[in-house]
Amino acid sequence: MSPQGQLTRKSYLENKIIFVDGFVGGGKTLFCQLVSSLDKVEMWVHRPLVEQVSGLYAHKNIDLNTAVSLLNCCFDNEIYCQALLRDQNFRHFDHSSVFKFPKKSEYLKRVLNSNDLELFEKFINEKRVLHFMSHGITSHIEPIHKALGNRLIFCRLMRCPSSMYMLNHLARWSKRWGNESRNGMMCNDINGEMVPHFILERIDEYANANEYERAIIMLEEWIEEGNKAVENKKYQIIEVPFEMLVFNPKKYIQEVSSRLDVELSDNVLREMRRQKVPRKSLDDAPKSSIFQAYGWRQPEKHISAKDQIKDELNEMRGYLKSNMMKRVERLVENYVSRYLDFKL
C-alpha cells in the first residue's frame, strides 16, 4: 500500500532556544557558561541529534519538511525533559555538569520536586530558555531556523585560525570522528576515510589529507560557508570573536540578554569572575585539568592578542607545508580584518 501523504510534526511549545555554535577548542565553554548565567536560561547541553538532522539535510539525505519535523520533536521533547531535569549530567567534574550551572539552587529545588505537571507548567509559564552547544553547524542553520523562527537565538563563536590549541584539537578529532562510539558525528565514507558532515565543498580533498591538513580544511570550510549564513540577515546570527570576548565579555553577553529582554544580574558578574573575564591575555583562563589534557597551558607572561597571533603563525610555519600555510595566512588575514581592531 502506498503512503497517502507526507508525515509531519509541528511544534507545540514556544520557549526560546539559544545555540552557541563553534569548533572544538574555539572557546564555546566560556561563552556558554556566561550565557547560562542569564536569568531564565538553562544550563547548556550538547545534543548530537540536532547536528545530525542538520547535516542530513545539508547533504540532501532528507528534505526540509522531514528535517523540521524531526527538530520539532526534538525541541519539544527537550523542553519537557529539561523541565524535569531528565537527561542531565550530574558528573561533578564535567564542564557540562549541573554542578557547573551558575544558578545551582534553581536545579536543587527542581530535582527535589516530584510533581511532573507542576514543574512543566512552571517551565512554560516562566518562559525558560533552552541552551544548546553545537559544533560547526552555522552553515546548516536553515532547518533549525525554519523550525524555530523568532524563537531562535543563534550565536557563532569564532576564534582566529592561528590558534594552535584549536588546530591541535581539530587534528586529534579528525582521527576520531566516524571511528568510535563516543561521538555522534555523521560522516561521509570516502573509500574508508570518514569526512564529517560539516564538510560539503571539500570532501575529496579532506579524505586525502593528513590530520593537520584536515584541521585547516575544516576551518576553511566552516569559516567561509558560515560567513554566507551570517550574511543572510533573516538568521540574525550573533558573531562572537573569542579574541574580543575575553577582553570585553559584557558586550557580547548583552547582545544575547537584549534578545531575551533580561538584565545582566549579579549571577552574570559572578560567572565572569569564575571564568576570569575580562582577562590579561587570551590564554589566561581558570585552571582546568580537562583543557590541560588537550594542550592548554597557563601563560608564563601576558602578551597582546596581536603578538600571540604572530607567535602562533611563526610556530605553524615550522611544520605546515607551504601551500597549507598560505591558506592559513589568508584565513588569518581575513579574520583579523573582519573581527579585530588591529592589523598584523
Regions found by a protein language model. Give the residues of each.
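PAPS-dependent sulfotransferases, especially Golgi type II membrane carbohydrate sulfotransferases
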Residues: 1-18, 195-213, 220-223, 227-239, ...
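Walker A (P-loop) phosphate-binding motif
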Residues: 8-38
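Hydrophobic/aromatic beta-strand patches that form the interior of the parallel beta-sheet core
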Residues: 18, 42, 153-155, 238-240
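Short His-Asn-centered micro-motif
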Residues: 21-22, 131-137, 157-159, 241-243
